[in-house]
């Protein structure tokens, strides 16, 4: 407990939040749980100043832009809200619609997809989680900002420890250069032991790119031919456990139809890790590059006429139907040594 200059009591949890915010304001490399501050008169000013700033940061929206792109991000979930071409004034990012999917571009951490019965194990204990983990529902702090770069950070709390029992800082970093948007994920392990986690992106794109045209005019095109596999889904929207060859059409293409998603996401493995979303008889398209991600999920709302498609780079798969996994021993989970950091990225490029 701490009293400010007006003798108002500052609750312990709020004080922790203030310190975390202040630490991230100073540097994105600080370990917030080790900062020690003497609450002198200077400390009183410090707390009040950053308390006001921390509260002001909730549910905020930030933009970055250059000559070609304008990108918007909100602090809840550090979620993309807009990817707009300044050249053609085209909004490429799905803008959310309750009828189909209200999200736009979730960041997935520390799990990808669904857990069996929304539960998973970690070091002998069972935890309950929403699909895609904790990042999507939590407020991030703006840790750093320039004209073309935004860095957001989520630090563990008592609430997150009840869902994912590890101390961490999860950074989501957006940077634009030319017609490219780079989305980086950085996980900082604050534990004195190894931790396990999964990562992924979930950006949705308007299809068609503009009001004219039909969904079926579009297709995916991989940059190289590989022996692509499809991880089949079960009616529960979990993985069935069956992996089958997937036959590409000519020129390494996958035609888009609404029927393609009747069983939920189409999950690809063994891709070349570069795919473009294109339209027939058009030179306008976008390219997703995901060099460190083993899987690509392609999704829209099943059994709908939804005018969007999500291209989702994943490090790991959702749960297999009927099986509750242990995250630490999951065969495709990422592992991070004590007090170390892991960083990866995917990149989006617009072609107009």
Residue ranges and their predicted role:
Residues 125-178:
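Extended, loop-rich substrate-binding clefts of extracytoplasmic carbohydrate-active enzymes
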Residues 156-209:
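Acidic, contiguous internal or C-terminal segments within carbohydrate-active enzymes
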Residues 2-4, 20, 27, 34, ...:
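Short, positively charged and aromatic/hydrophobic N-terminal segments
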Residues 127, 132, 137-144, 254-330:
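Acidic/His-leaning functional-site neighborhoods
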Residues 73, 120, 124-128, 185, ...:
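Short Pro-Gly-centered flexible turn/kink motifs
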Residues 207, 211-290:
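Active-site/ligand-binding surface loops and adjacent short beta/alpha elements
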């Amino acid at each position: 407990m701490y009293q400010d200059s007006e003798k108002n009591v500052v609750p312990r949890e709020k004080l922790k939040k203030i310190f975390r915010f202040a630490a991230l304001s100073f540097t994105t490399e600080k370990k917030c749980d080790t900062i020690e501050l003497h609450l002198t008169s200077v400390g009183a000013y410090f707390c009040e100043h950053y308390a006001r700033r921390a509260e002001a940061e909730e549910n905020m929206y930030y933009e970055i832009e250059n000559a070609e792109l304008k990108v918007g991000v909100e602090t809840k979930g550090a979620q993309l809200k807009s990817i707009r071409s300044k050249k053609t004034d085209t909004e490429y990012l799905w803008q959310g619609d309750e009828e189909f999917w209200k999200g736009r571009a979730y960041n997935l951490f520390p799990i990808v997809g669904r857990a069996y019965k929304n539960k998973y194990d970690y070091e002998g204990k069972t935890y309950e989680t929403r699909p895609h983990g904790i990042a999507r529902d939590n407020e991030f702090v703006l840790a750093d900002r320039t004209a073309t770069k935004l860095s957001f950070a989520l630090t563990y709390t008592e609430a997150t420890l009840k869902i994912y029992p590890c101390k961490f800082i999860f950074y989501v970093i957006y940077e634009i250069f030319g017609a490219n948007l780079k989305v980086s994920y950085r996980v900082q392990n604050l534990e004195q032991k190894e931790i396990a986690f999964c990562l992924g992106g979930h950006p949705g794109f308007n299809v068609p790119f503009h009001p004219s045209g039909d969904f079926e005019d579009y297709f995916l095109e991989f940059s190289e031919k590989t022996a692509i596999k499809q991880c089949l889904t079960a009616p529960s929207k979990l993985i069935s456990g069956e992996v089958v060859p997937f036959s590409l059409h000519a020129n390494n293409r996958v035609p888009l139809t609404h029927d393609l998603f009747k069983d939920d996401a189409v999950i690809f493995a063994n891709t070349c890790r570069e795919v473009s979303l294109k339209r027939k008889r058009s030179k306008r398209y976008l390219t997703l590059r995901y060099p460190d991600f083993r899987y690509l999920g392609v999704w829209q709302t099943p059994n709908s006429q939804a005018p969007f498609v999500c291209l989702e780079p994943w490090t790991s798969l959702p749960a297999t139907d009927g099986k509750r996994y242990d995250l630490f021993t999951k065969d495709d989970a990422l592992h991070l040594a004590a007090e170390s950091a892991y960083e990866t990225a995917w990149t989006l490029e617009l072609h107009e």
